[in-house]
Amino acid sequence: MIEFWKSEYTRILSICHDSGTQYRNKNVRMRSLYLEKVWVAFKSFAYWKEVIWKTKQEFRAQYSFPKTSLEANKVDDANTHSPKFVMEVIDVFVENLNDLMKINDPSSWLFVPGHMKEQIEKVLKELKLLRFFVCFVSNKCIQPQYQHTTFYTHALIEASHNAMVVWLHLPVYGIGNQDLAPSEVSRLLSDFMEMKIKSIQPGISRNSIYIDVLQALKSTIPQAQQKHVAESGIVEIPTHSLTVGLSDQMANLQEMLCLLRDNLIHLPILDLEFHLQDMDSVIVDAGLLIYSLYDIKGEKEDTILEDIKRELGFDLPRNIEPIKVMVYLVMQKAFQCNLPRIHGLGYVDFLLKNLKDFQGRYSDSLAFLKNQLQVIQTKFESMQPFLKVVVEEPHNKLKTLNEDCATQIIRKAYEVEYVVDACINKEVPQWCIERWLLDIIEEITCIKEKIQEKNTVEDTMKSVIASSQLARTPRMNEEIVGFEDVIETLRKKLLNGTKGQDVISMHGMPGLGKTTLANRLYSDRSVVSQFDICAQCCVSQVYSYKDLLLALLRDAIGEGSVRTELHANELADMLRKTLLPRRYLILVDDVWENSVWDDLSGCFPDVNNRSRIILTTRHHEVAKYASVHSDPLHLRMFDEVESWKLLEKKVFGEESCSPLLRDIGQRIAKMCGQLPLSIVLVAGILSEMEKEVECWEQVANNLGTHIHNDSRAVVDQSYHVLPCHLKSCFLYFGAFLEDRVIDIPRLIRLWISESFIKSCEGRSLEDIAEGYLENLIGRNLVMVTQRDDSDGKVKACRLHDVLLDFCKERAAEENFLLWINRDQITKPSSCVYSHNQHAHLAFTDMKNLVEWSASCSCVGSVLFKNYDPYFAGRPLSSHAFSISRILLNFKFLKVLDLEHQVVIDSIPTELFYLRYISAHIEQNSIPSSISNLWNLETLILNRTSAATGKTLLLPSTVWDMVKLRHLHIPKFSPENKKALLENSARLDDLETLFNPYFTRVEDAELMLRKTPNLRKLICEVQCLEYPHQYHVLNFPIRLEMLKLHQSNIFKPISFCISAPNLKYLELSGFYLDSQYLSETADHLKHLEVLKLYYVEFGDHREWKVSNGMFPQLKILKLKCVSLLKWIVADDAFPNLEQLVLRRCRHLMEIPSCFMDILSLQYIEVENCNESVVKSAMNIQETQVEDNQNTNFKLVLIEIHLFCLFDMKGIESISTDMKEKKLTVTRDVDADEVQLVVEKLRNVAYADEVQLVVEKLRKRGML
């Protein structure tokens, strides 16, 4: 056969060589020819016209496919038969055909009409698959490549045929009708397609060539370790062949091969390495089966499948079974390998709810799985108590085993969701789904058995091996720099203070120097000399109770007196008796759990002799738990002066830093993030380098990488000991931008939507999530930036940069979170998709979202983060991307957080897994199809500036979305109030409802009846009438926060508020009087915060507050109210802590009874009458001097506003007369700078003018 091909096709190879040369040697590119718009004006046009014409004449003269015989041209180049040459030729041909297809201008001489484009697209696919085949044979072959010359030759001829068609397609002007007619070109392309099943020569066909080469490979399949991308490509070849002739009869085989192909691309090579040989066998067997069938059918046109199977002796079910096994294995592995390794324990809750919904909504599609799904549901429900234990007992002695089992359970939950969805959408065959669910049931059963076995194991883990302890930095003789004020405070507590025993506890994040500071005090002679016994022990995360006791006894009575053979209880008694009559100083370092203190505290007797215990811990809760008299000390981070002082001391010792290095040194110290440990690490690097500016500059440039790598072990240790239910919450901080304050309510809503929060009967998910957050704060992993004034709850937080970087890096390692930055180098088309399954993707550019969307079908979250501060608060339009259509690729999307920054063209109502949406919209209505999002829990839609002020119509179908927990839309109104009243369900889960717009009290009552469990409500009302008697509007009993804004300012409120558990009330724009406030107060016995803004106080502008009104009120704020006379009874506001008065210009004075409110801590007066200021100062004098209220604070502010409306870029300029500071609220145009300065100089306060000039100078405007 080889000789036949050599003799018969040598002439064709000669033409192939010519066509390849035209493409490759002369660098002819179809696209480049098209883009050369000025051909006619240059000599190049004549040259190329001649080249094209001569080549076409040569092709047609020598080979007319195959009308004319070929002349014998002797071409026997060994390189022509090499796979490398063949692949290079195919690459060139594919590139040119692609260029040809991109030309869409009908006036171009290269334009390809539509019917011919379809044929060329088919040919392109054939060429790509042919290249895969050549690559596969070349990679898998262990014999010399010349053994497959026939195959490579045939591949080259097929590719070259297309090259000739491309050249023949090119027209030549001025030659009349001598060009190849379009119909002939079309036939030539059809000839090529027919070569797939037609015999080229009696006894020789394309299929027979493929059979020969596959049989050769089958006999010697090696242990090949090739990239699996090639594997997925080679699967496409036999799969694609099934589209001709027998596809209807071989549908099952075709389906399996398609599944194999589609899933291989998602499977990392490491997960295939133990199956590559089996994979090769399956691919070769599939090819042999298909090509053998087609080889016989090509010779016998009327042959049916049964005849072919009989002739070949095939048992089709038996031949297909290995393929089926491999398909299932690859599908399962492709899904499992990309699951995140960190999970939220609330995912099982979400799955169980969805399984019930699925079986109701898709009963027909899931009918054949009914029994299996019920078994799975029962097994998951039986696991719920175990998952509860994992959350509630994070320090269980079998913590590792528990968390491993919990992780396996969550992974099975992911699989069930995926398989059920695939069944509903018919994306996976029934045989595969049934096998997969049976395996899941078996695996869940094994997990349950492991848990049950664990529960029967005797607990013998009182002592834990300490081999995994984090290597500690040297503590003794370590000179401390900084914290001088802290040291002095602690020294006084150790030597003075209460007569009884006291615990001096320090807590703070890793690396702050707690241990160093404690050892400094412990070794201070002035301290130690005052105690009879000094002893210390280091606890760490893993410890032995007995070893701690032995360490303390060795210090207390000496090494020789310690009896190590005693039991722990006996040693504890010995220690207690040793300390009992003495004044002792004990250092207990690095305590991780309250239970440690429970174990040790009984050994430390209190006999009122000023004994002291120093305790260090990372966790606030531990420090607070151990405290007796002194409050726990939260060790602060270094300031810039201390940071530089420590760095200088560590690098230069007793010497001083060179003036040349001081600036760069201070910059490096600042870059260390004020963390002493980080500063010490960098100092070690600098100490080993030449003291040259260039060297230090290099350190500064690389500081981020080095400091984080070196300090990672400390942070990693804190992360390692986190309970598994907190790990996902902590890593999720990696989705936020650096140095940005994080809003807590938003963070908690995201945590819940991501299934990080495990439900607990009797508690809301929000309350549980707040507990998770406080735990992370107590471990010093999260920094609080703002707490609520009334209840002390955290309102905002942030992460230190070191911790944030750790979260991002670790989250990527765990396949949990991937950042796709606008300068991302790795594109989805050029990488292995290791993050496309159930991960969270954070984007910084909308274009990245478009590029990645096609490869992210199983992503669970899409988070958009805008780095550019210029766009802060400015929504970005996504119309150019049609984002709603792009998002359809994310079929498992549960969280879509566009951070109020992206305008979406429409809500993606097809994504029924969605639980959280936050975005901007331009429309004034929402489609009724939004109810398709039946899993949605949080809907936050902001309006663009064009839509601001307009009422948005909310369809009545929203009230069918019974899982909604948070609905935030500015100024919305129900579209059909009658339908809302008659047909809609109650939203029992809805907790926050922001900005509905009511025009009647009846409308408000109706909506409140539909939302019985609201906790927070912000709404706008339009009160049209002033009734003779107030109507009592009953708000939900659980309501805690209410903000009411009146759209028609200073209209009377037409209802009385009744909310027995309301803690926060804000009224704005109303006309009120004492009667209304008195009646309201009777219904608000638990109110803690009252804010009245822009309120008109009746005709007399008077407010009488009697005894018993607002008994729990802590904060009272009045702003721009018309209040003139304020009469307050002596015993009113008994628990008031803060009083804020802003622009209350008519108020005569603050009532004198505020002098006697012992709980009062703060009064703020801004832009009020001088008499009000005077009364506030009198209250301060009485509170501080007479009541000894040392915590009382008075703040007086006077602000003058200069509105420079004629100046571009200026909104307002405010001068604070008390603090002498000036603020420009917007940037100023450079052209207007001088005008701004001149106008400011007219202000009487020259120092304020100087301040703004300095600001402008820093901005580069002066």
Curated annotation (Swiss-Prot):
GO terms for molecular function: ADP binding; ATP binding; metal ion binding. The keyword Iron-sulfur does not apply. Its main location: cytoplasm. Keywords: ATP-binding, Coiled coil, Cytoplasm, Hypersensitive response, Leucine-rich repeat, Membrane, Nucleotide-binding, Plant defense, Repeat. One of its GO terms (cellular component) is cytoplasm. GO terms for biological process: plant-type hypersensitive response. Residues 364-384, 475-496 form a coiled coil. It is a peripheral membrane protein. The keyword Aminoacyl-tRNA synthetase does not apply. Pfam families: NB-ARC, NB-LRR, WH_DRP. ATP binds at G508, M509, P510, G511, L512, G513, K514, T515. This protein is encoded by the haplotype B genome of the allohexaploid Solanum demissum. Belongs to the disease resistance NB-LRR family. Confers resistance to late blight (Phytophthora infestans) races carrying the avirulence gene Avr1. Resistance proteins guard the plant against pathogens that contain an appropriate avirulence protein via an indirect interaction with this avirulence protein. That triggers a defense system including the hypersensitive response, which restricts the pathogen growth. This is Putative late blight resistance protein homolog R1B-23.
